[in-house]
Amino acid sequence: KTSYLMINRSIILLGVVLFMATGCFARKKQDCPRADIKVSYNYHYKFWRGSDGVVEKDTPFILLANHNESKFYCPSTEYRDSLLSTPSGSAKEKKMFDAAVAAYVQNRDESVMDAVVYHSRLYVTKDFAKSVSTTYDQAGMGEYGYYDEPFSEIDWQIVEDSTKTVLGYQCIMASTDYHGRKWTVWFTPEIPVQDGPWKFCGLPGLILEAAEEKGHHHFTADGIEQSSQSIYPIYNNDYEKMGRLDMLRNLRNYRDNNNSIIKASTGGMLDFGPDAPVQTEYDFLETDYR
């Protein structure tokens, strides 16, 4: 897991308050907006994947935020997308992928594929002036979509007398019923950034932890630092505007039948076994598509 330097909260606060906005009209570093704060999160989740059954994983994510906008993303995803955005990078990525496939075909060791497959296709950007989030994600085999949502989709209930400490910050509890799941989050007014992991935002402080009631999805901050890192646009241009529910239904079909789909698309070179009956108890972050 990537670890980030913990710094004094007064320095973080100063950096957040003193932010000066800039526009971003190209991918050049000097033209992109800069973050005030960088928060690393671990996303722990359980899901059902064909014949693999219940899979439990941890994936690192990063939130880059200032008072105007933010981006939540998986760093390995952004790295691969950046490679694929140039001819030389695409050649490098293809070489890595082909080598991993050859090793898998020879040894049938699925672990060799971990370094060359996407562990997430998720990006979430937020525009605080418009109070709108934009979610980019996979929508099936080779399909990628995006959609916009108003911040008002999330209706928070703050529980002032319920507190806990996360990364040394005093946090207050809030809860919401959001798109089929009940969530509990912990936010700290000590860091006046109304943002957090995934789509979560709109509370009077940074959200450091978020968990849904079944224990299948859990975001936990594991590092905070003042940062002037550039908030780059998303490299992948293959995302098409889609409806949120359509994206989730398409992805559900792919996940439920992924082994047979992958086998067919690779001419049988990759065969992870037969698909298995679907267990709907383990599902996506949002379940209201069913």
Where are these regions (language model features)?
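Structured soluble/peripheral alpha/beta segments that form catalytic or ligand/cofactor-binding pockets
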Residues: 182-184, 193-229
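Short, charged/polar low-complexity linear motifs in solvent-exposed/disordered segments
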Residues: 89-92, 183-185, 189-191, 201-203, ...
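Extended beta-strand-rich segments in extracellular/periplasmic secretory proteins, especially
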Residues: 145-189, 194-196
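A generic structural motif
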Residues: 46, 175-177, 211
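Short, hydrophobic/aromatic-rich segments at coil-to-beta transitions
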Residues: 35-40, 167-174, 202-209
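Bacterial Sec-dependent N-terminal signal peptides
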Residues: 1-34
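Extracellular or lumenal secretory-pathway regions
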Residues: 25-155, 161-163, 170, 215-290
